[in-house]
Design a protein with these regions (language model features):
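Long, compositionally biased stretches enriched for glycine and/or charged residues
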Residues: 187-463
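Rossmann-fold NAD(P)-binding glycine/threonine-rich loop
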Residues: 90, 94-162
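Glycine-rich phosphate-binding loop and adjoining beta1-alpha1-beta2 segment
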Residues: 26-63
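Rossmann-fold dinucleotide-binding core
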Residues: 18, 144-213
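Short acidic low-complexity segments
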Residues: 67-80
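N-terminal Rossmann-like dinucleotide-binding module
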Residues: 6-39
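Redox-cofactor binding/interface segments in oxidoreductases and associated redox assembly factors
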Residues: 79, 85-86, 147
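Short, surface-exposed basic-aromatic patches at helix termini and helix-loop junctions that form
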Residues: 26-29, 56-60, 138, 157-168, ...
Length: 463
């Protein structure tokens, strides 16, 4: 008799957990799941318990004999797991708000995965994911780690390079949304299109073809420039790309490229929100509160439509499909973060890239793109250098490397203010940055203070 699968979700109190359950329920005939463990920390106790009750209602309504467990002991959950998914946020949403508001208080972009905010999310997350990997080596050495904790590419690279854990795939919802929306914009069957993606997490481009091999990239570009929905995530302001630039490159940039191709306008929009309705993290906090009120309803046994308003919608469904592809050796085309292995010849073989892959029992097999045009090549090499410095600084706590990563980042103007933002973020996140302990103590002796009043209120409440 086939053994039922054990799935562990670290960060089980996420608002996306019902979407994860929906994805597993939809695939139950292919994935014989027996038990799901939702792991969280004490601060997330209320949310994970709400999620667990709703998840159990969803499974019961579907008529499947699957038991949902909750634990605050990660090691208890990991014992003999088959698949581990990660969707945790170190420091909770309050940390995201700090990541956004401190840079914006100095007129720099504050964003969850880009600029200074993205670097600090990596600093907080990488030590934790490496601890998880050490537990997995002992407790579930044959399990696959499916990561969709942001910044997904850097976290995945840390797992594979520093954690020495090869059975890891990083996921992102941005390619998934593009491949859902572009066929609608072109009024064609999704099964009639072939995609090829190349780049890094939240920094990739793609081309589109029909089944006869005819390129349709320019038609998607036309649809995008005409204002049609081609898959912009809900959390990104829809500033149009310059048509001349996009048509010349004949590659479809991802939504996050707006932060780089229209930096001025994206910064202006972020500053406007910062000064009025609050940053995206503050807005998401309100959205999450409403979602969890819905989840409390004892009669709710399906994913509510309101969840699609979150910027990370469809992450979870991608995770379920990835697990399905590995377990059943389906050789499914997906866009994931994995080892380069020559797919992008201008980057090192062991770099983690986000490219088209075929997913099966051996994991992800990347599809080679070949040489890139000068602009895309230059962007990727600079961004990868920034990522490598960020990851090494996250592991070592090296302040100079952290400053190097800031200097390399296109969204952080170098100079005194950049150093000030780095220092303030270190102080703001000191409870989650043990690797920077000596640096933070030095900054505190120098009386480094935080300018933003909202961040100061959050820190006071944390005490």
């Amino acid at each position: 008799m086939e053994k039922g699968l054990k799935i562990v979700t670290i960060g089980g109190g996420s608002s996306y957990t019902p979407e994860l359950m929906e994805g597993f329920i939809k695939r139950y005939n292919e994935l014989p799941i027996k038990e799901i463990w939702l792991v969280d920390i004490e601060q997330g106790k209320e949310k994970v318990n709400i999620d667990a009750k709703m998840s159990q209602r969803m499974w019961d309504a579907a008529g499947y004999d699957v038991k949902v467990h909750v634990t605050f002991d990660r090691r208890e959950a990991l014992k003999d797991a088959d698949f581990v998914t990660t969707q945790f946020r170190v420091g909770l949403l309050e940390a995201r708000i700090k990541d956004e508001r401190i840079p914006l208080s100095y007129g720099m972009l504050g964003q969850e995965t880009n600029g200074a905010g993205g670097i600090f999310k990596a600093f907080r997350t990488i030590p934790v994911i490496l601890d998880i990997v050490e537990d997995m080596k002992e407790l579930c050495p044959n399990a696959w780690l499916i990561n969709f904790t942001n910044p997904s590419g850097m976290v995945t690279e840390a797992v594979i390079k520093y954690g020495k854990w090869e059975r890891c795939i990083g996921l992102c919802n941005v390619p998934t949304i593009a491949m859902m929306k572009e066929p609608i914009a072109l009024n064609v069957d999704p099964n009639e299109l072939i995609y090829q993606f190349v780049g890094l997490n939240h920094f990739h481009w793609h081309k589109v073809y029909d089944k006869d091999g005819n390129e349709l990239t320019s038609k998607v570009i036309d649809a995008m420039l005409d204002g049609k929905d081609v898959g912009l995530p809900a959390n990104i302001n829809n500033v149009p790309f310059f048509g001349e630039q996009i048509r010349e490159m004949n590659m479809i940039p991802c939504g996050y490229h707006r932060y780089y191709y229209r930096q001025q306008e994206m910064l202006e929009h972020s500053l406007m929100e910062y000064e009025t309705i609050g940053t995206r993290g503050q807005q998401v906090k309100e959205t999450e509160n409403k979602l969890f009120e819905l989840y409390k309803n004892p009669n709710l046994d399906h994913k509510p439509e309101e969840l699609s308003k979150r910027g990370g919608a469809y992450y979870s469904d991608a995770a379920c499909e990835c697990i399905n592809a590995i377990y059943n050796n389906k050789q499914t085309h997906m866009v994931v973060s994995t080892k380069n292995r020559g797919a992008i010849p201008e980057l090192p073989e062991d770099s983690i890239v986000e490219v088209s892959c075929y997913i099966g029992a051996k994991g992800a097999m990347p599809v080679a793109w070949g040489k890139l045009p000068s602009a895309q090549r230059g962007w990727l090499q600079c961004m990868k250098a920034m990522e490598e410095c960020t990851i090494e600084a996250a592991v070592t706590g090296n302040y100079g490397l952290a400053l190097e990563a800031f200097t390399l980042n296109e969204l952080i103007p170098s100079g005194e203010n950049a150093k000030r933002v780095l220092d303030e973020l270190l102080i703001a996140h000191k409870n989650y940055l043990p690797q920077f302990k000596s640096t933070i103590e030095k900054l505190e002796k120098e009386n480094v203070t935080i300018k933003d009043s909202v961040v100061n209120e959050i820190i006071a409440h944390e005490r």
